[in-house]
Design a protein with these regions (language model features):
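Solvent-exposed loop/turn segments at secondary-structure junctions
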Residues: 100-103, 171-175, 234, 281, ...
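Acidic/His-rich structured neighborhood in mature extracellular/periplasmic domains
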Residues: 118-270
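Flexible, glycine-rich surface segments
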Residues: 223-224, 228-334
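C-terminal soluble interaction/assembly domains
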Residues: 293-382
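C-terminal motif of bacterial Sec signal peptides marking the signal peptidase cleavage site
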Residues: 16-19
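Bacterial N-terminal signal peptides that target proteins for export
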Residues: 1-9
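Acidic helix-start/capping segments at beta-turn-to-alpha-helix junctions
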Residues: 90-115, 168-172, 181-189, 289-297
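An acidic, Gly/Ser/Thr/Pro-rich helix-cap/linker signature
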Residues: 23-145, 151-154
Length: 382
């Protein structure tokens, strides 16, 4: 939900980027950092625990062997968080103290070394990972199994059943792959040891998510010591970040208890609510039935908002697709998006509605949102 537009979908990045080179903080390197030079030869050396062995959990205390509460920045973060959100300072610091540095998380987000060739982006390859027989077949079975829950969500929010199912299918293969990283560790690692010093905004974003996770724990909404998710801290069947859980998760039963990891009804309702809160319009398609000329590539602005209209597109040479009619979409904002094959120089252009851009708020990538739309179309058996 927070990735830049051109990042590959998070649920895929573990497989795709786990081999990224760059400055990787390994367990042994962190241990060395934690056991810096002794202040004086007269003082006894402090006995530190051994670094995690490969057979053990691949996480060690934040900042080498130093508990996070003993790192000035982290302690200040905890004190400020407790004060700003009226939380128990002691409980906040105790929870932070249990966070562990996860080198695998850092390796995944470490940028490639300078001079390394960039892998050309391919819409066909990306789409093929999600719009494929396994997800289509399991998606249709999912829609049958949860037909009542999907129907209730569609009636309440106006988001089609196949769109909700497609998002859950892309994110976690319909709940089967929710991630195995302890979210507390992932967010603490990314918030305070983000490997790219040129992106302080990313570190700040992850610290904000860590703050939301801690608040959710201390207010009884989830157990931050146990909850697992993606390497980036996304949680549950719909892969909500902690901030999205706070703002957009809803209970299907109307109770105060929301469980996105085990309760499919809550997950389905929350996905629909998220889309509506980010601009989903009942009755609009994701893409307008329009044929665009090649010259329409100049209308692509790379943004996440529809800034054009149908008269402008017609003036640029766009035409109705065969058999299509002008209806609500023709009176709504539109945008032209590109889906490139960089190696060959080819590009597919589509005319997106507000609903496409609502999906990009889930993951800020044209590839992601178009894959969701295409999978949804494949799931629609009407």
């Amino acid at each position: 939900m927070f990735a830049p537009r051109r990042l590959i979908l998070m649920s895929l990045t573990i497989a795709v980027l786990s081999g990224c080179s760059g400055t990787v903080v390994s367990p042994s390197q962190s241990a060395d950092a934690g056991s810096a030079k002794k202040a004086s030869p007269k003082k006894p050396e402090i006995k530190l625990p051994d670094a995690a062995k490969p057979s053990q959990a691949q996480s060690i205390p934040i900042g080498g062997h130093t508990p996070v509460s003993r790192r000035t920045a982290l302690k200040e973060f905890g004190v400020e968080l407790a004060a700003s959100r009226q939380l128990s300072e002691a409980r906040v610091l105790k929870l932070i103290d249990e966070a562990r540095y996860n080198p695998t998380v850092i390796r995944i987000v470490t940028p490639p070394a300078a001079g390394q060739p960039r892998v050309p982006r391919s819409w066909a390859n990306y789409r093929g990972r999600f719009v494929e027989p396994i997800r289509i077949n399991q998606g249709r079975a999912f829609m049958q199994q949860y037909a009542n829950e999907l129907d209730r969500a569609t009636k309440r929010y106006g988001v089609p059943q196949n769109i909700i199912a497609a998002i859950i299918g892309v994110e976690t293969l319909y709940g089967k792959s929710q991630g195995n990283f302890r979210v507390l560790d992932a967010l603490a690692s990314l918030g305070f040891d983000y490997p790219n010093p040129k992106r302080p905004d990313r570190a700040a974003m992850f610290r904000g998510q860590l703050a939301d996770l801690i608040e959710l724990d201390l207010t009884g909404k989830l157990d931050a010591r146990a909850i697992k998710g993606s390497y980036a801290g996304a949680i549950g069947i719909p892969q909500f970040m902690p901030g999205s859980i706070k703002r957009f998760a809803v209970s299907a039963s109307g109770s105060n208890s929301i469980d996105l990891s085990n309760n499919m009804s809550d997950a389905i309702m929350s996905v629909a609510n998220f889309l509506v809160e980010h601009g989903w319009q009942r009755g609009l398609p994701v893409f307008a039935p329009v044929t665009l000329p090649v010259s329409a590539d100049k209308l692509v602005d790379g943004g996440l908002k529809a800034n054009l209209d149908w008269p402008q597109l017609r003036a640029a040479g766009a035409k109705l697709a065969p058999g299509a009619k002008e209806n609500a979409w023709a009176r709504a904002p539109l945008g032209v998006i590109d889906l490139p094959e960089e190696a060959s120089g080819r590009v597919e252009l589509r005319t997106a509605t507000t609903n496409f851009f609502a999906i990009t708020q889930y993951n800020r990538s044209y590839f992601y949102a178009a894959s969701v739309a295409d999978l949804a179309q494949a799931l629609d058996t009407r």
